[in-house]
From Swiss-Prot:
GO biological process: adenylate cyclase-inhibiting adrenergic receptor signaling pathway; platelet activation; regulation of smooth muscle contraction; regulation of vasoconstriction
Function, in words: Alpha-2 adrenergic receptors mediate the catecholamine-induced inhibition of adenylate cyclase through the action of G proteins. The order of potency for this receptor is dexmedetomidine > norepinephrine = epinephrine > oxymetazoline.
Extracellular side, ranges: 1-33, 97-106, 174-184, 364-376
Protein name, as recorded: Alpha-2Db adrenergic receptor
GO cellular component, one term: plasma membrane
A GO molecular-function annotation: alpha2-adrenergic receptor activity
Gene: adra2db
UniProt keyword list: Cell membrane, Disulfide bond, G-protein coupled receptor, Glycoprotein, Membrane, Receptor, Transducer, Transmembrane, Transmembrane helix
Compositionally biased spans, kind Basic residues: 276-286
Species in which this protein is naturally found: Danio rerio
Organism placement in taxonomy: Eukaryota, Metazoa, Chordata, Craniata, Vertebrata
Length: 415
């Protein structure tokens, strides 16, 4: 039997220049290997638990049942698959220094790795387009934004990611003891462009456009708001206190309007609008009753002036109520867009070092020497992104915080 065949079948040995087998040395010391295993295990657990909480929260919380949140469910599913089907094998390959599971699983492992990374950024690209259409075509697009349409968009995202990921990797032959990405220049550059740089550029351009539209809309709302606040000053309102009629300026209500404005500004992005509609209807009814009771009984000019003032006062109030509802919807869209912008920015920050060094290696192989340790560090920073999204939702979204607390408290009471 040929000696090279024997050494090829022994995974813990390597062949030296004389053709004799030598023990394969691990790439890290024992302490470093233990530390790597502990850190990566924590990343896996945080990724699985956090993204499972996201999925459960979207399906169980009324405030999070908006159709567009299905994108977040699919994105969380991709991160869970990364933590279960990719990271454990990457950890074994990193600690042992060689690939133990054969060439067949290597091909699927690499395909799944590229698939989930590509699907994450394509998801974010689809989310940015969804945000753009909801901002620029608010009425028409929101009527079309049904769960069925969102599910179709998610299916298209996964199909595009699979078409990009699987064919090149499954057609490539792999060594039994090495599981590496295709090292040809054309594949490296094309995969980096299609899987990261092109979708990332689309996201940046779309969000720049969203920012411009939001800025223009904010200035328009500011002008309309100032005009609305000046209108009530043209009339005065009559109130009856302790049997006496008084004339009171609408400026006395400014503090109440400021309080309502503060409440409105504090509403979170996906908060259910049912309670707000009830609150606004109760407020409108109470104001009508107050307007009816505020004027004294008919008494010549005073009663005519008082009724006329009440009519003039109710018109701006109705206008203000409709503006409050539209502003509430705009606030939700604005805060939802901000949270997703943070998610996209963190994704780009986590994966840009890897894709930059990977493409740089393809362009200048000889003149640009990139240490393996640095390349591996960037690779693992990209994996860490799978555990970050639930943390972002928790920090920036009150509804997710409430849903997570409810899920955890429910679980603790059962145990």
């Amino acid at each position: 039997m040929d000696l090279s065949t024997i050494t090829f079948l022994l995974p813990n040995s390597s062949e030296d220049t004389n053709g004799t087998s030598a023990p394969r040395l691990p790439p890290h010391s024992q302490c470093a290997s233990v530390l790597i295993v502990l850190v990566v295990t924590v990343i896996i657990l945080v990724t699985i638990v956090g993204n499972v909480l996201v999925v459960v929260a979207v399906f169980t919380s009324r405030a999070l049942r908006a159709p567009q949140n299905l994108f977040l469910v699919s994105l969380a599913a991709a991160d869970i698959l990364v933590a279960t089907l990719v990271i454990p094998f990457s950890l074994a390959n990193e600690v042992m220094g060689y690939w133990y599971l054969g060439s067949t699983w290597c091909a699927f492992y690499l395909a799944l790795d590229v698939l989930f990374c590509t699907s994450s950024i394509v998801h974010l690209c689809a989310i940015s387009l969804d945000r753009y259409w909801s901002v620029t075509k608010a009425v028409s697009y929101n009527l079309k934004r049904t769960p069925r349409r969102i599910k179709i968009m998610i299916t298209v995202v996964w199909v595009i990611s699979a078409v990009i990921s699987f064919p090149p990797l499954l057609m490539t032959k792999h060594d039994e003891l090495e599981c590496l990405l295709n090292n040809e220049t054309w594949y490296i550059l094309s995969s980096c462009i299609v899987s990261f740089f092109a979708p990332g550029l689309i996201m940046i351009l779309v969000y720049c456009r969203i920012y411009r539209v939001a800025k223009q809309r904010a200035s328009t709302v500011f002008v309309a708001k100032n005009g609305m606040e000046r209108q009530p000053s043209q009339s005065e309102t009559c109130f009856v206190r302790k049997g006496k009629s008084e004339v009171e300026s609408p400026s006395s209500h400014s503090s109440g309007s400021r309080e309502r404005k503060g409440e409105l500004d504090d509403i979170d992005l996906e908060e259910s609008s049912v309670s707000n509609r009830h609150r606004n209807s109760r407020f409108a009814k109470s104001r009508k009753v107050e307007g009816a009771q505020s004027c004294p009984k008919p008494n010549g000019r005073l009663s005519w002036a008082c009724s006329r003032a009440s009519e003039l006062e109710q018109e701006p109030r109705a206008r203000q109520l409709s503006l409050s509802k539209s502003k509430l919807a705009q606030m939700r869209e604005k805060r939802f867009t901000f949270v997703l912008a943070v998610v996209m920015g963190v994704f780009v920050l986590c994966w840009f070092p890897f894709f930059f060094t990977y493409s740089l290696h393809a362009i200048c192989r000889k003149s640009c020497t990139i240490p393996d340790s640095l390349f591996n560090l960037f690779f693992w920073i990209g994996y860490c992104n799978s555990s970050v999204n639930p943390i972002i939702y928790t920090i920036f979204n009150r509804d997710f915080r409430k849903a997570f607390k409810k899920i955890m408290c429910r679980h603790s009471t059962r145990t």
